Curated annotation (Swiss-Prot):
Organism superkingdom: Bacteria
Mod. after translation: 4'-phosphopantetheine is transferred from CoA to a specific serine of apo-DCP.
GO molecular function, one term: D-alanyl carrier activity
Annotated function: Carrier protein involved in the D-alanylation of lipoteichoic acid (LTA). The loading of thioester-linked D-alanine onto DltC is catalyzed by D-alanine--D-alanyl carrier protein ligase DltA. The DltC-carried D-alanyl group is further transferred to cell membrane phosphatidylglycerol (PG) by forming an ester bond, probably catalyzed by DltD. D-alanylation of LTA plays an important role in modulating the properties of the cell wall in Gram-positive bacteria, influencing the net charge of the cell wall.
Family, per entry: Belongs to the DltC family.
Name of the molecule in the record: D-alanyl carrier protein
Annotated SUPFAM superfamilies: ACP-like
Membrane-spanning parts: none
Protein species of origin: Streptococcus equi subsp. zooepidemicus (strain MGCS10565)
Carrier domain mapped to chain residues: 1-77
Amino acid sequence: MSTKETVIDLFDRLFMEDVSDMMDEDLFDAGVLDSLGTVELIVEIESIFNIKVPISEFGREDWNTANKIIQGIEELQHA
C-alpha cells in the first residue's frame, strides 16, 4: 500500500473521514483534526511507518492537509 493509501485509510479508521477528495483541504478547519486527534495521528503514523515525528516538526501549518502529511512522512522516511 502506498503512503497516500495508508494515510487515507488511517483517517478513515481513526476519524471515520474519507479524505480522498479533500487532499489539499485544511483538516483542522474542516473539523477532521483537533489537538487530541493530532496526538492520535502522530502515534499511529510513528507505529505504521516506523518513524519518529518530532513535535517540533508537526506544526499545524506544516501538516494541515493530507498531502502535507504524506509529504512529511516521506521526508522523515528518507531522513
